Design a protein with these regions (language model features):
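Hard-cation-handling environments
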Residues: 1-6, 10-11
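Extracellular S/T/G-rich loop segment that most often corresponds to the catalytic His/Ser-adjacent loop
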Residues: 14-95, 99
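Substrate-binding/active-site groove segments that recognize
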Residues: 59, 139-140
Length: 151
């Protein structure tokens, strides 16, 4: 069966790990988050990498996503890993930022939220930003609020 599949004009394209950000993350208005191990500050091998095929800088930044502790339905702390964990952390950060902005300035849009979070990202020494793995750096909501406080 496998031989029949490979007969004829079937060939495999040379893959490129630097174009693994897909829809909906490859859209300008969407916040796209890479995920990393907070213990050793390394991007997960399975985290999407950018940029997009149209050269948008994606991911926008990275959030913790390896062995992140949270409470399960039984009230116990458990570790979870994956892009969904980083997405949940990012969504929580955006919700807190949105609440603050609504009380202060009105209703922000998704691009404003993303740009303000980018403004507060942490960047490691010796790396050029933005880059294909980390985007603009590591999510740091405290730093975002600190920057906004000083404006």
């Amino acid at each position: 069966m496998q031989e029949a599949f490979l007969d004829g004009e079937v060939f495999f394209l040379r893959s490129n790990p630097d174009y693994t950000v897909m829809a909906p993350g490859n859209v300008r208005a969407v916040t796209c988050t890479a995920y990393y191990n907070g213990r050793d500050k390394s991007v997960a091998v399975s985290s999407g990498r950018g940029y997009t095929r149209t050269n948008l800088i994606k991911p926008d930044f990275a959030a913790p996503g390896i062995n992140v502790l949270g409470v399960n339905v039984r009230g116990q702390f458990v570790g979870r890993s994956g892009s969904s964990v980083a997405t949940a952390i990012t969504a929580g950060a955006e919700a807190l930022l949105m609440e603050w902005l609504v009380r202060r300035d009105g209703t922000p849009n998704s691009i404003q939220l993303k740009n303000l979070l980018i403004l507060g990202t942490q960047r490691m020494d010796g790396r050029e930003y933005p880059n294909r793995e980390w985007g603009y750096g590591m999510l740091d909501l405290y730093q975002t609020f600190d920057v906004l406080r000083r404006l």
